[in-house]
Amino acid sequence: MNLNATLIAQLVVFFILAWVTMKFVWPPIVKALDERAKKIADGLAAADKAKADLSLAEKKVVDELRKARESAGDVRASAEKQAAKFLDDARAEAARIIAQAREAAEAEAGTAAQRAKEALRDQVAHLAVAGAEKILRREINAQVHADLLANLKTELQ
């Protein structure tokens, strides 16, 4: 019976130990496990939220980059258009200045040609008068008259 009494005593001690454990030890352990499980769940939820926020931020960045590229393309096209307009205006201004200079040069050349013609007319008239004077001063002789006309001809050339 010693064995039975020992067994019963061990059973009583075991149940007392189990009861003390269930009453005083088990609740803090369960509480700590529940808190740890809650922290893990909160951490996973925060990680999922952060992942979703990261995905949303990446989409926003992609959209902003696309908008920036489009804006840069528009700015570039506008700058090219302004440069082309500036070049066209400069070419038109240069063509106008060249045409104006050409007209002025042609007018000047025309005026110079007119002055040269008038000077030539004056010289021809003077030579004709001088030739007529020489002819009239000398006797009218066919040979002398022909020589004078030949001299006049060479002077005019």
Curated annotation (Swiss-Prot):
Membrane topology classification: Single-pass membrane protein
GO MF annotation terms: proton-transporting ATP synthase activity, rotational mechanism; proton-transporting ATPase activity, rotational mechanism
Cell compartment(s), UniProt: Cell inner membrane
Keyword field: ATP synthesis, Cell inner membrane, Cell membrane, CF(0), Hydrogen ion transport, Ion transport, Membrane, Transmembrane, Transmembrane helix, Transport
GO cellular component, one term: plasma membrane
InterPro entries the UniProt entry points to: ATP_synth_b/b'su_bac/chlpt, ATP_synth_F0_bsu_bac, ATP_synthase_B_chain
Transmembrane feature ranges: 7-27
Domain of life: Bacteria
General function of this protein: F(1)F(0) ATP synthase produces ATP from ADP in the presence of a proton or sodium gradient. F-type ATPases consist of two structural domains, F(1) containing the extramembraneous catalytic core and F(0) containing the membrane proton channel, linked together by a central stalk and a peripheral stalk. During catalysis, ATP synthesis in the catalytic domain of F(1) is coupled via a rotary mechanism of the central stalk subunits to proton translocation.
Assembly information from the UniProt record: F-type ATPases have 2 components, F(1) - the catalytic core - and F(0) - the membrane proton channel. F(1) has five subunits: alpha(3), beta(3), gamma(1), delta(1), epsilon(1). F(0) has three main subunits: a(1), b(2) and c(10-14). The alpha and beta chains form an alternating ring which encloses part of the gamma chain. F(1) is attached to F(0) by a central stalk formed by the gamma and epsilon chains, while a peripheral stalk is formed by the delta and b chains.
Name of the featured protein: ATP synthase subunit b
Organism lineage: Bacteria, Pseudomonadati, Pseudomonadota, Betaproteobacteria, Rhodocyclales
